[in-house]
Structures are given as structure tokens and as C-alpha cells.
Amino acid sequence: MHIIKPSWLRHSGEQKDFEVYSCHISPDGSRLATAGGDGHVRVWSTKAIFNADHPDHGKPRQLCHMSHHLGTIHSVRFSPNGRYLASGADDRVICIYQLDSNPPSHTATFGTNEPPPVENWKTHKRLVGHDSDVQDLAWSYDNSILVSVGLDSKVVVWSGHTFEKLKTIAVHQSHVKGITFDPANKFFATAGDDRHIKIFRFTPPPPNATQHDMVNNFVLETTISAPFKSSPLTTYFRRCSWSPDGNHIAAANAVNGPVSSVAIIERSRWDSEINLIGHEGPTEVCMFSPRLFHTQKPSDNATDKGSPGLVTVIASAGQDKTLSIWNTNTSRPVVILQDVASKSMSDLAWTPDGQTLFASSLDGTILAVKFEMGELGWVATAEENDKALQKYGGSRKGMGTAEDVDGLHLENHSKEGELRGAESRMGALMGDFQPEDKGKPVTTNGSRPTAKNGEANGTTEPKEKEAPKAAPAEENVEKTAERIAELKSRVQVTKDGKKRVAPLLVSSSATGLLSLPQSQLVGAKSTKTTQSDTPQTILDLSKPSHGLPRGGIAAMLLGNKRKAAAMEGEEEDELAGRRPSAGPVPILIDTPEGLEPAPLSAPAQGVVPTPEYLRPAVISPAISFSQTRLAVPKVRSHIVRPLEKGVLQGESTLDEASKVPENIVLEAKNPIRLREPAHISASKRGARLWQDYLPRAIILVTGNKHFWAAACEDGSVHTWTPAGRRLLNGIILESQPVILESREHWLLCITSVGLCHVFNIKTMSAAHPPVSLAPILDIAITSLSLEGPTPAPGVTSAHLNSVGAVVVTLSNGDGFYYSSTMYAWQRLSESWWALGSQYWNSNDSSISALSTTAVGPVTAKNINGTASSTTTTTTPDKPDTAATAEVGVSAGIIPHLERHTTSEFLLKGRAFTLQRLIKTLLSKDGFEGFESTVSVAHLENRIAGALALGAREEFRLYLFMYAKRIGAEGLRGKVEELLNCLVGGLLQQKGAPTNGGGGSGEAKGWFGKGEMLGGWERRELLKGVVLILGKFRDLQRLTVQYARILGLTADGEDEENDDNNGGGGGENGAVAEEMELEEQ
């Protein structure tokens, strides 16, 4: 062990040495940053420090110094990627510095003894958000956020990409003096003078996150107070540290009885059973070494089972001027260094290799303690560190070096797409737009307009030709300026009679162009249509044809599961107890004239109420033998349904339905006596269009611009054309219909025995055989009871989409879709995802923006600047009607079902209880990766549902969200499988037969070899996924191969440009053959 304390390593002044409050090492270990009472941040060369005893060492000692604060600087921290340096001071400001590659423009400061700067660190941002001194700073391990704490009791979260303020957390009751991050990137902890440590759970925000997006992020997980109940309030800092394996937090300024100590807090349980005792005064700071250590020297051929145990090393220091170093293998300190400074120790910093410790003191000195190999142990590899973090669902993914030049090129393209998405979203929020002519191409995010007529990128027309096109834009600007001048000159008379110019709202005076660079402005048309998280189409579901009762249609089941055998005699007692004492209530009575409705019994007051319905429908005998029984609608005297613009509206009165003259009103009247026929008619503007009579009472009606339908209480369904001509013979069903829906030429009918029928009136065929609702009503887990049927979840709605697929929702929140190809129900939404998934009821806004600005196949351009291959081209002879018809199929169904699940979930009042159960579950051993696993599974469920439904827009959106998540999680196996499935038959030569392609050109499912998947070309989907995965360096060895096929690498772009200029090249074909050999 060597202690290095150079005399020049200090913050020197003219009369004294200033206090050093903070120190930190850069991720590459080459720089030491210190902050002191002189208001300077100084950057030192660690190589010069290690060679301080060599007088012939000619390297510069101080690399740079920055004095952009107005007071004492309390904290300085490098970002984990080494790109930024942050400092916080008592002037309430946080400065973000960035290293400029250009040499410094100035020499030594005039009138001082400061050496000339070697590096050029420039102020990148100044963050203002605290009301008092900024006491400590910390970066998340993925650089996504920066958190600052201060004497104003606030915890402020800043974006690590845009440095916007994301959230201000005020949960501490006193000064906050310490902050540390979980290396698994799940939590961060803050320590304050209220004698509490607060643990916050967070999800790393995307690069374009805003304060509005983070409302439900950064949630307080727990509060720890036991080790600090009588801790002194005299310490300047309470700097805590998280162990590199994620298991423990070391908290400074704790007490164990009357003795000062360092509390070791265990993860998950969040309690402190271990205390490091040895300091004679309160501790200010403790710091874990960033590396794990082996207690024994590992052999070169040691297996995982035979490798020695791993330990962590921690250093602590405080007001007793003593530096102690511990490891988890011994109960006593490894080394104690006393009186290493004349005043209190303020901060500690380890080098990335874990072998050298730097310490700063309030006496103005900085020392380095360098250990020899084996003194602390033998440093474990970075892979072993990552392996220790995997049980918590975190690792240092994406922090390695780029795979090669192509990998770096792909990463730059990926980040450019994210940046365009962030700028596009910011432009939408700020209302940026440019006055444009309709004939002028829309420029998105400052990119060049799409080339026309085969022009190559970069070629522009002469300015003389563009002048006439700019005239309308200039006219719009002039009109806007005139309006603003008129608003500014408006005079207002106050109450006391004085005249003054009325104030003008800033937003109303916007001229359409902000004082931002043109690259940050976004076209109004593009921002309005591309920045929504949900597809910009109407919901592809039929509107409910009649109002269902609250809670849905009641359902009863005779289950398949056998109940435990009951004792003899118990069943009879239970049946006797269930019999009503007043006897059965009559529905019909037998009179000489036939069956008549039973008269209503007079109430106690003697007033007979007016019934809302005539009578219950006559129950079909088939329901007695069915295991599933749904409630049958009652027979109403009058049913009125208006048809507005081809869409059937809800039930209303005849006066309300006739208010709109264009409405066609369908009216059904049921007689009071059973022997009289029911009357049905359609009218418009009071004139009857057609009428008809039916021998049975009508209980349900539906219709659209293609046909009308009515269901009777005898189980028959009748259909008419819009002019009143009967389409089909009466369709006889097994029991009374309880739900009747229509969509275009499709008719849905669900009967009281739970059978679902779907008819195509145009082709006079059925979409599939009748299917029972029993499986989705949980009949498999319902016990077979002798006393009678068991209540089941109610059916709250049943819909048809434009291709005749059935979607059913239940009162328990579940949403189902019936697959006519698999002949089975599929659950698309359930409350399970609401509890465990981080994507519930939300989309990744960065992916929504990215899919439309970087890799979108319709409006965006490819990386090489050419138009996207899926941009539809039409000719006068053959318009592209099929493509436009397929865009809206099943649009919005999955978000609709998830919103329904949330509504039912909250309506039942179960949300709070189940959330507490999940929170308790997450704190148990073995469930550390629960949230991450469920979130990935939820995205996979969304993708499968969108693919089955044919929801084109949702499929692409969820696929890109899934690719981003599994890339961030480092799930290499899933990434490789996803890319292989997306490739399909792209690697096969043209003209070769494709297995599974069929004759339609589109192979459904992941394993097909056709060119289409989910309504998109496989090449476009593969390109989008590769661009999203391109920034994850751990996956670049895999993604670069696909990028070469798609021409996203530098060589691929050059070759494609050569092809456009007439040249030929075969590299893509060679790469394709190479990948085919690898797959084999």
C-alpha cells in the first residue's frame, strides 16, 4: 500500500488553502475532479499524481479549472459514460460541463499563478431548481438521469439527455445531504438531517421524456430510520454508497447505542443488522469499491463452481480524521489510517479498477491510497460484476465499446433517429410550425425535402424557381403580422377611467416561427399526425346496439369441476332453506282466452306503478339443459333506434330520434296481448319507408346502411334490406338472443345458452361454427353445484370488427377475441398485466416519435435518403384501394380493451389491495426481476394480439417497443430470435419458392417466409428493429450483420449510392450468403 499526498494537489489561494469538499474519478480513470471553497472545479491528471515522486515526469498536473459558480462548490461528479461533468454549489446552481475536442482558446489567467489549461471543458448547461445550497449529486448508471439534493429539503431529478427538470420530490423534513444509486438501476437512496434514508423506485426515462411523463415515476419505496434515531446533526455531509453487487447500502452518520457507526442496510428487507464500528466521531462519507474481489487468487482454469467467494470493499471517513477500509469477509477493518488530515474528511472516490482510493479533506489536502495486488483481494472481472446484478434484473448493458466501424455507424443512426423523435415531440409540445404551401414538400425536423422525379439527394432547384412558391408563405406571415399589430394597439379602459394598451398574451402573439434553429422546428401537419401514442384511426369495433345493464349481462354456470362430497342429508337441508317462503312468482296465468300476463300485485300503498317493460320473455326449455345461462332481455312495449349517417345510435324516444332530419328511425312495437303480432317499421322525416309484422314479440333490433335485423323471443332472427325487403328466411337459433350486433355485412348474435353466432349476410354464410362463451366465463374452474348454477362474470359488451371477428369484454376486466382460424378464444387483456407491467395503459413516447420520424415506412425517409419502399404508389388505372382498406382493420382494439380492464379494475375497488400485494411480492427473495419479466411478457402479449387481429399500426408500434425493451435488458436470445423471424425469406434468392408464403403473398405468423408480416413488409420492420437495437453495443455483433444486408452501414450506403449512379455491387448478396451459412 502506498499513500500519495503531493504538495501541489490542493486548492491553493493567496493566503490559505481552501477546503476541498468533493472529489471524483472519471470512468476511464485518467482524471480526478475536485471541488473546493475557492469556487473552482479542478481536473487533475491521475497519471501525474501516481508519478508525483518522479521529478522528471513531464506530463501536466492540472488539466483544467472552471470557475463558473459564485460560491463554494459542494459536489462534483463525472457521468458514467465520461461525457459530462456535473458540479453543485451554494449558489443554488448545477453546472454541466462537456469536454470540447478543440484546444483551449486562452492561456493562463492574468494575475494568477494558475497553469495554462490543457483540456477545454465548456459549460454545457446551467440547471436551476433548488432554493438553497446544492449539497450532493449522483448520476444513474445508464446516464439517463441526474439527481441533486440540497439544504432546501428537495430531491430534484434531471434528464441525463436534455437536462430538463423531470420531477421535484419533497419528502424529507430537513436538509438532504447524500444521494446514491442502485447499480441495478432500479432504486436510488437519499439521506437527510431528518434522520431518514428514503429509497425511491424508478424506471429509466427515455431520452425525450418530459415532466408530464414522469408523474408516476420516482415513487417512494420505503423509509429507513432505525439506525439514525440519535445521530448528530453536526456533519456537513451524509454521503451514502451502494455496493457493486446491489445487495447493501452503506449509510454514514449512523449510531449503535452511544457509538458512531456506519449502517449496512440490506436490500429488499431494507433493515440494518450490521454496523461498522470503529470511528471515534461521526462519519461524513462512506464509499464502496466499484469492483468485487476474490478472497483467494482465482486460477486461470477455475470453473464457476470452484471459484472462490466474492466480497465487497468499503471505505469510510469522517470527523475523527481517520480513514477505515473494510471488506465483507472479516469483522475488523483491513486497514485504519489515522490523522491523515488535520480536519474532517469530506469525500472519497475509487478508481474504476478498485485498487486506488482518493480522499479529500476540509484542510485543503487530497491524498491517494494505492493498494498492491492481493492486499484487498483479487479484482473480479466485469462479467462477474454483471452476473451478480442479474438477479435484480440489471446490468451495465450498452456501456461497452463499439463492435467495429459498422457498429459505430449503426449506433449513430440509431441515436439520430431518437434525437429526431425527441425534437419532434418537443416541437409538438411547443407548437412549432412553419407556414407552408400545399404544394411544397413538408420538411420534418430540418431534414431535406423528399426528392422528386428521381432526383438524387442533395440536388436542389435554382432559387429563381423557388421564389414563386414562397409567395403564399410570405403572404401568410404578413397577415399574421398585421393581426399582431392590431392586437398590440388595442386600448382598454380601466375602472378609474384611465386608458391603457391591453396586455397581449405571449401565446397569442406567436408568429409561427420561434427563435430556435431551423433544425428544431417541426411541420404542423407532421406534428399533429405523428406524435400521438395511439393510432390515428377510429376504433374498428361495432357500436353497441342496445344498452346493457350495469355490470353486464348476468351469467350463471354449471361448472365442470366437481365439488367435494357432502354429508348425507346436508343437500336436502340446503335446498329446503333456499325455497322462497311466499312461493313462486307467476309470470303467466291460464285464462279461458289463453295465456295472459300475470297481473301486478298491489303494493302496500295501493298504487300500481307503471311498468318499464311488458313482461319477461318466455324462457326457452333449452336453457334448462345448458351449462351456461345468460339473462334474457325483457319484452319492452316500444323500441326506437335512430340510424345516423349509417351508424346505429343508442335507444331514445321517437321525438329525440326525429330531431335530425337525415336520421332513419327504426321503430318496433310489441303488443300487450300475446296473440297480437309485433309491428316494425322504418321512417325518415316522419314519412314511413317500410313496415312489417312479426308473429312473436321483438326483444332486440340492430342495423346499418346495408341491412336491418330483429330478434324475437322465440329465438328467431329476421333480416331486411334498407328498403324493407326480406333478405333471408327466419334464422332459428337454439334459444333467445341476448346480444345482437351488426357491422357492415356481418351480424353477431349471442343466445341465452352462451352460443355465439356470426353471419355474413352478403355471402349468406357463417364465419365459423357456433362457439360457446363457457370457456371465457371460467367454467373450467367453477364447481358443479347441486343447489343450482354459480354466478359467473357478466358480459359487458360484444363487438364485431370490420372483418367479422368477435371481441367480448367481461365484468372482471378481461377482454377476449375469437380466432376463426384456430377455433379458440384468445385473452387480449386482463388485470394481471395492470398489476405487473410497466407498459400498462401507456406507450413509449420515444418509440411513437421514432416510428414516424426515423423508421416510419410511410412519411419518413430511410437512412440513405431515398423514399421508403412501402410508400404506396398508385396509377390512374389501378388505385391502391386494398392498402387503404387494410390500414384500419382492428385499429384501437387492444388499447380499448386495456382501458376497459382499468375501468372495471378500479370500479371493483381492488386496485389498492392488489397493488399492495404486488409490492409485498417484489420485496421477497426470488422476485427481483418480476416487474421486468412481466413487462416484457405484456409486450409479447400485445404483439401476438395485434398480429392475430390484423391491427397493422399497433403491431408495428408494439414491435418497436418490444425491440427497445429487450435490447435494454440485454436479452440476446430473444433479440436473435426476433431478428431471425423478421428476416423470413428475405435471404432467399428472387424466384425461389417460399415455404408458407402461399399464393396470397402474405404469410401469417412469425414462421412464414412471405414478404409481408402483420401488414408490413418484413424489410421495413427489420430495418426499424435494427435501428432501435443499433445503440446497444453488447448486441452489435448480432445487429451489424443485419444492418449490412439492409445497407445501413457505411459500406452499404456507399455501395447503394454506386448502384444509383449506375455501378453494381454484390456485397449485400455476399453477406446474405454468409448469414445463410451461419444459420445452417
UniProtKB/Swiss-Prot annotation:
GO cellular component terms, A-Z: chromatin; HIR complex; nucleus
GO terms of molecular function: nucleosome binding
GO annotation, biological process: chromatin remodeling; DNA-templated transcription; regulation of DNA-templated transcription
Compositionally skewed regions (Polar residues) per UniProt: 442-460, 520-539
Keyword S-adenosyl-L-methionine in record: no
Subcellular location: Nucleus
UniProt WD repeat ranges: 15-54, 68-107, 129-168, 171-210, 232-275, 278-336, 340-381
InterPro entries (UniProt xref): CAF1B_HIR1_beta-prop, HIR1-like, HIRA-like_C, HIRA_B_motif, WD40/YVTN_repeat-like_dom_sf, WD40_repeat_dom_sf, WD40_rpt
Pfam families to which the protein is assigned, alphabetical: Beta-prop_CAF1B_HIR1, Hira, HIRA_B
Keywords from the UniProt entry: Chromatin regulator, Coiled coil, Nucleus, Repeat, Repressor, Transcription, Transcription regulation, WD repeat
SMART domains according to UniProt: WD40
Sequence segments annotated as region (Disordered): 430-479, 520-546, 1051-1080
SUPFAM superfamilies: WD40 repeat-like (SSF50978)
Coiled coil: 469-496
Keyword Amino-acid biosynthesis: no
Function statement: Required for replication-independent chromatin assembly and for the periodic repression of histone gene transcription during the cell cycle.
Protein family per UniProt: Belongs to the WD repeat HIR1 family.
Protein name: Protein HIR1
Organism, as annotated: Chaetomium globosum (strain ATCC 6205 / CBS 148.51 / DSM 1962 / NBRC 6347 / NRRL 1970) (Soil fungus)
Organism lineage string: Eukaryota, Fungi, Dikarya, Ascomycota, Pezizomycotina
Gene: HIR1
